[in-house]
Amino acid sequence: MWAKLFLRPSFVNRVHLTWSCRALLTMQLKTKEFESLFTDGLVGLAEIFQKNQFELRIAGGAVRDLLSGKRPEDVDFATTATPEEMKSMFQTAGVRMINNKGEKHGTITARLHEENFEVTTLRVDVQTDGRHAEVEFTTDWQKDAERRDLTINSMFLGLDGTLYDYFQGYEDLKNRKVRFVGSASLRIQEDYLRILRYFRFYGRVAAEPGQHEPETLEAIRENARGLAGISGERIWVELKKMLVGNHAGHLLELVYELGLAQYTGLPADGDVEEMKQVWQRAHVSSPKPMTVLAALFRKQADVENLDQRLKVSREEKNLGLFLVKYRRDLVKGHDEHDTMKPYTDFITDSREPDTQSKVLELLKYQGENKLLDELRRWSIPRFPVSGHDLRKLGYTSGKEIGTILQELRDMWKKSRYQMSKDELLSTLSQS
């Protein structure tokens, strides 16, 4: 197996640490998650780079995941080869290349054995404007690491299992610490979206809320205005990832404390206390991002304003409007034998196809976890009587048929949806 050719057998499930004069921490990794990456496609890719004497390493988030004992969903690669050199050797090897859009950023996507591999040339930032960067290619791994946002995302992993860590990212990962590479202000000013990326990774990595470095929070506060120039779509992508991670309630509170809300579409007068309470009772149920945000909104206009800034989906916007409208009015019933009745009646009466999913989010918002489990198991019953049934009985007036159908539906609901068509129609002959 190709992985075994690369890996040193003396370091099974442990590490070997060395320090170089350039403050490079190296370690030898051998885990089942790492070995599982070596598909026929990756073996073929590695052979091409080895044959042409270019280095190829796993980069960024995939390294972080592997060091955390996870198999990464996406694996990005970095190399000393330029895009032109990659194109030449892939063409020589008969490897198909797809998605040419990434080439200007140094990324070539090669397809081997029905797998896509994104390989990016090492880069340094020449000029940045807070949103995008002009880059030059380099063969210096440390310079590429210096341009990355967080220490835990700045590591490389050789295909022999050697970790290359220039900024103590591995130590930070072990200590569940999130730090910017070098100066937090400089990293943020290169791309202001890194403010929200910091929050997102804090929620993913940190063990507890409130363990931020003071200088990091101050850098975020000083650069908050930079988010005004970031597109709403990019902000929404990061916010959603933050909101489904750990500590989302704490991180949203920081968004307000550090003056970020006004630049991200959130209401200036957001109800932070309500949001903290909702997060406390709802996070165990994995609420959707909009469910958490809805707690900040005091009125439906806040949802509209958020949509204008972030361009949320129609489904997300409708969920926000629904929660703001019904969070106080649609609550569990007083009948101890059927506390779910108001919710099931609402769903049954609704003409919207996704009402049940919205009510599920409402129950998360309200912290009604027992009812949430019940409603997940509940199927929407079908009202057994139609206008056609009434016409067969001799009713002809459309208005009368509509009135009778509503009366029968109310009767059916009171029976907890148990009355059959015959039982319902039989009540007409009794009246």
From Swiss-Prot:
Gene3D superfamilies: Beta Polymerase, domain 2, cca-adding enzyme, domain 2. Residues 1-31 form a transit peptide. Nucleotidyltransferase that catalyzes the addition and repair of the essential 3'-terminal CCA sequence in tRNAs, which is necessary for the attachment of amino acids to the 3' terminus of tRNA molecules, using CTP and ATP as substrates. tRNA 3'-terminal CCA addition is required both for tRNA processing and repair. Promotes tRNA repair and recycling downstream of the ribosome-associated quality control (RQC) pathway by mediating addition of the tRNA 3'-terminal CCA following cleavage by ankzf1 and repair by elac1. It is an enzyme of class 2 (transferase). Monomer, and homodimer. Keywords: ATP-binding, Cytoplasm, Magnesium, Metal-binding, Mitochondrion, Nucleotide-binding, Nucleotidyltransferase, Nucleus, Transferase, Transit peptide, tRNA processing. CTP binds at G61, R64, R148, D191, R194, R197, R200. This is CCA tRNA nucleotidyltransferase 1, mitochondrial. GO terms for cellular component: mitochondrion; nucleus. One of its GO terms (biological process) is eye development. The record marks D149 as: May assist in discriminating ATP from CTP. It comes from the Eukaryota. Belongs to the tRNA nucleotidyltransferase/poly(A) polymerase family. Expressed ubiquitously during early embryogenesis. It comes from Danio rerio. InterPro entries: Bact_CCA-adding_enz_type3_sf, NT_sf, PolA_pol_head_dom, PolyA_RNA-bd. Its EC number is 2.7.7.72.
